[in-house]
């Protein structure tokens, strides 16, 4: 995937929001590397909110209500879950700098978590950034089958109900494509982003 990278040693929360507003997002090479770099993909992944697809099997699982779904009650714990190695993710880019920046955005009302709980146990979740009428999905994790998928369904329901226009997934995967994620060229993405960012900040 072609992308633009540029090192950025000292990122503030306000700088991070500005970066999102123009199509950039930060990453680190590893959890142990304190440096961040900006990423600007030439091809961007989005999930069109009006074309979100839920498979029959997942819809059936959701109807069984296997988890208690909560919003913004354990943001730091969700980030920690996303930072843990998984079979499809042996390493993580979530370093201490990322944790602290997104915790600050959460305190500012611009970063949010969707959580799947079994009793008192957090078993899956996702987090991302809201700005204007755009939501930028960052990462997700599961400790039970289907937990992150069910969180994504609840995220989309919430975004639709609040009037969000853009769900940015940064890149696409086969997993996300099963929900309707598509690749769009940078120029097309910038048009969608500008429209969503022109909106006042929507309540999540």
From Swiss-Prot:
Principal location: cytoplasm
UniProt cross-references to Gene3D superfamilies, sorted A to Z: Leucyl/phenylalanyl-tRNA-protein transferase, C-terminal domain (3.40.630.70)
One Pfam family per UniProt: Leu_Phe_trans
InterPro entries for this protein: Acyl_CoA_acyltransferase, Leu/Phe-tRNA_Trfase, Leu/Phe-tRNA_Trfase_C
GO biological process: protein catabolic process
GO molecular function, one term: leucyl-tRNA--protein transferase activity
EC supergroup of this enzyme: transferase
SUPFAM superfamilies found in the cross-reference section: Acyl-CoA N-acyltransferases (Nat)
UniProt keyword annotations, A-Z: Acyltransferase, Cytoplasm, Transferase
Catalytic reaction(s) noted: N-terminal L-lysyl-[protein] + L-leucyl-tRNA(Leu) = N-terminal L-leucyl-L-lysyl-[protein] + tRNA(Leu) + H(+); N-terminal L-arginyl-[protein] + L-leucyl-tRNA(Leu) = N-terminal L-leucyl-L-arginyl-[protein] + tRNA(Leu) + H(+); L-phenylalanyl-tRNA(Phe) + an N-terminal L-alpha-aminoacyl-[protein] = an N-terminal L-phenylalanyl-L-alpha-aminoacyl-[protein] + tRNA(Phe)
E.C. number: 2.3.2.6
Subcellular location: Cytoplasm
GO terms for cellular component: cytoplasm
HAMAP family linked to this entry: Leu_Phe_trans
NCBIfam families hit by this protein: aat
Role according to the record: Functions in the N-end rule pathway of protein degradation where it conjugates Leu, Phe and, less efficiently, Met from aminoacyl-tRNAs to the N-termini of proteins containing an N-terminal arginine or lysine.
Family affiliation: Belongs to the L/F-transferase family.
Name of protein: Leucyl/phenylalanyl-tRNA--protein transferase
